[in-house]
């Protein structure tokens, strides 16, 4: 059986300004499928190679796949749907599957607007795809599709979601097949070397209200440091990778394993062969201040910090457990350790003004990170913050949910004024850095890296790809009143998806009511126990067993929920 994976052709001028990034989802899925005996696997990176729809038709006709898998984040969803629509035209007998975070949580929306999609994989895909491939290869599709956990599909006029599949418990068992990647296309511009995106863990124990990763991966699992370094050694020695970014939301959460990972990199001499970067939190920088130089020795050269907002009000709204002062100190600590710092700011909520935009610039310049990014607040439609702000959302064209297009309109600014304010911050920050910092700060690697970053910005700016400025028609302050973001106003939320949201909100409300009632009951019982005439109920020993074993079990259950585990992620269809 022939399996074809396609990465949809979507561009927005965001992270791609630093280079082309290899789609890691393909090697991880392919590796697990090959382990199960499916070895006829092909891959088309339509994004990196800018493959047109006509070229896709030709490739589909040539390959004649039996199973086609496409992924999608929110902004690329329409292109992913169109890719599978083309597949239906050219290879109608192929089973068409869509996965990724957007399809996982918005499956009713996707199946309503793209009925030609045969199935949606909900959640991490390795084990689900193996079961689906077996079903197709054994001729049991579509009759037995309902027996596969983690799918959603049309059954007549109904949209059906099967029971949620369990997460992959032993993630060390996942062996990605990097040979499917044509590595010459994936270059990290600042260093001019091949780049990869392996991962050390899945999930995140934090529940930031604007993020979806903790919901998608459901529980937090960390790989063996040795297994991760084995994978990196393979990438370096066999595919000539010179830079990698760990795909984790925060690889430093588990300090013990991160330290072991760094030591393993040093022990194998990989710190002299490959440089790398991570995303992490300010709190971890504080915690590890005495280890930062050790991390640098292990090859860690670039840390992107989720400082998120200059105003503490925004940090609180995003559930960020840091303060403005801590952000500044974290950047200073990294600078002392000779680790490049990238500060991330989120702008564009309803309380944004010209003054708050100016505040983020002044704060960025005061903190002096090596790099600064201003991202438009993008309300992922499956996050808690979206539900809180739902009445304020006017744009449902998901192709614009890309961190560079102002989805939300601030009360005091037009979208054009917001974009102009962000560009003003970029111009001032990088012009000053280019003139007074990058060419003169440090020697050797530091200078080369900073000038390489400047090259990436200039290349995207001259080509008008940065921040989608060319598409929007922005050429400077004089055009802020004429920019056109080309929102497709015909895009609406499907009735089935709205009903799903309302049902989820109702479940959440009832769960909260039960919790509040239980707290009140426990409070009343505690008050009763303090009275002189209190008599313990006959069944109290079972109900209030406070043995060490019970306490430990309850603590573990609570911890899982606090980390975003369990039913807060992906509710089974039966519930």
Swiss-Prot record:
SUPFAM superfamilies in alphabetical order: Cobalamin (vitamin B12)-binding domain, Radical SAM enzymes
Transmembrane segments: none
A cellular component term, taken from the record's GO annotations: cytosol
Compositional bias annotation for Basic and acidic residues: 513-525
Alphabetized UniProt keyword annotations: 4Fe-4S, Bacteriochlorophyll biosynthesis, Chlorophyll biosynthesis, Cobalamin, Cobalt, Iron, Iron-sulfur, Metal-binding, Oxidoreductase, Photosynthesis, S-adenosyl-L-methionine
Major enzyme class: oxidoreductase
Annotated Radical SAM core domain residues: 190-417
Cofactor(s) named in the record: [4Fe-4S] cluster; adenosylcob(III)alamin
Key word Metal-binding present: yes
Disordered as annotated region, ranges: 504-525, 551-575
Domain of life, source organism: Bacteria
Pathway given in the UniProt record: Porphyrin-containing compound metabolism; bacteriochlorophyll biosynthesis (light-independent)
Binding-site positions, [4Fe-4S] cluster: 204, 208, 211
Keyword Isomerase: no
Limits of the B12-binding domain: 9-143
Comment on bound cofactor: Binds 1 [4Fe-4S] cluster.
Task performed by this protein: Involved in the tetrapyrrole biosynthetic pathways leading to chlorophyll and bacteriochlorophyll (BChl). Catalyzes the anaerobic formation of the isocyclic ring (E-ring) in Mg-protoporphyrin monomethyl ester (MPE) to yield protochlorophyllide a (PChlide a) via a six-electron oxidation and the formation of an oxo group at position C13 using oxygen from a water molecule.
Family named by the database record: Belongs to the BchE family.
Identification of the protein by name: Anaerobic magnesium-protoporphyrin IX monomethyl ester cyclase
Species whose genome carries this gene: Rhodobacter capsulatus (strain ATCC BAA-309 / NBRC 16581 / SB1003)
Phylogenetic classification of the source organism: Bacteria, Pseudomonadati, Pseudomonadota, Alphaproteobacteria, Rhodobacterales
Gene: bchE
């Amino acid at each position: 059986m022939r399996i074809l994976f396609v990465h949809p052709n979507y561009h927005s001028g965001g992270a791609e300004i630093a280079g082309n990034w290899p789609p890691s989802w393909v090697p991880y899925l392919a590796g697990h499928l090959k382990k199960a005996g499916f070895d006829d696997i092909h891959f088309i990176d339509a994004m990196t190679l800018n493959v047109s729809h006509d070229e896709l038709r030709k490739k589909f006709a040539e390959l004649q796949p039996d199973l086609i898998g496409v992924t999608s984040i929110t902004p690329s969803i329409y292109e992913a749907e169109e890719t599978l629509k083309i597949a239906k035209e050219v290879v109608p007998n192929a089973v068409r599957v869509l996965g990724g975070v957007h399809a996982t949580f918005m499956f009713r929306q996707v199946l309503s607007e793209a009925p030609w999609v045969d199935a949606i994989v909900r959640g991490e895909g390795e084990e689900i795809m193996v079961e689906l491939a077996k079903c197709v290869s054994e001729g049991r599709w579509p009759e037995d599709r309902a027996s596969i956990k983690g799918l959603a599909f049309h059954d007549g006029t109904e949209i059906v979601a099967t029971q949620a599949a369990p997460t992959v418990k032993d993630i060390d068992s996942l062996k990605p097949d990097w040979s499917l990647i044509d590595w010459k296309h994936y270059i990290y511009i600042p260093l001019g070397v091949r780049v990869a995106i392996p991962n050390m863990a899945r999930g995140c124990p934090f529940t930031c209200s604007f993020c979806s990763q903790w919901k998608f991966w459901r529980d937090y699992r960390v790989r063996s440091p040795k297994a991760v370094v084995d994978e990196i050694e393979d990438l370096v020695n066999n595919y000539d990778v010179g830079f990698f970014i760990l795909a984790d939301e925060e690889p430093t959460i588990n300090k013990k394993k991160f330290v072991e990972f760094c030591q393993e990199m040093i022990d194998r001499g990989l710190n002299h062969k490959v440089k790398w970067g991570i995303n992490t939190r300010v709190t971890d920088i504080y915690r590890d201040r005495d280890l930062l130089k050790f991390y640098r020795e292990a090859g860690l050269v670039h840390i992107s910090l989720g400082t998120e907002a200059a105003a503490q009000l925004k940090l609180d709204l995003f559930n960020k457990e840091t303060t403005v002062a801590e952000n500044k100190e974290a950047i200073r600590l990294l600078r002392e350790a000779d680790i490049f710092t990238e500060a991330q700011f989120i702008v564009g909520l309803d309380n944004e003004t010209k003054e708050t935009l100016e505040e983020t610039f002044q704060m960025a310049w005061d903190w002096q990170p090596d790099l600064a990014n201003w991202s438009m607040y993008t309300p992922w439609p499956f996050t808690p913050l979206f539900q809180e702000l739902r009445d304020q959302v006017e744009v449902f064209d998901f192709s614009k949910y890309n961190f560079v297009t102002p989805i939300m309109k601030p009360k005091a600014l037009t979208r054009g004024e917001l974009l102009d304010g962000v560009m003003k911050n970029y111009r001032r920050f990088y012009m000053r850095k280019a003139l007074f910092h990058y060419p003169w700060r440090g020697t050797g690697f530091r200078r080369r890296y900073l000038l390489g970053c400047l090259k990436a910005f200039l290349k995207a700016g001259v080509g008008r790809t940065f921040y989608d400025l060319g598409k929007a028609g922005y050429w400077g302050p004089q055009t802020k009143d004429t920019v056109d973001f080309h929102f497709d106003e015909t895009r609406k939320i499907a009735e089935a998806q709205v009903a799903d949201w309302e049902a989820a909100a109702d479940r959440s409300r009832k769960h909260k009511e039960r919790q509040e009632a239980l707290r009140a009951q426990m409070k009343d019982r505690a008050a009763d126990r303090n009275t002189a005439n209190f008599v313990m109920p006959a069944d109290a020993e079972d109900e209030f067993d406070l043995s060490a074993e019970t306490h430990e079990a309850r603590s573990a259950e609570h911890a899982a929920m606090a980390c975003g585990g369990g039913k807060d992620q992906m509710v089974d269809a039966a519930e």
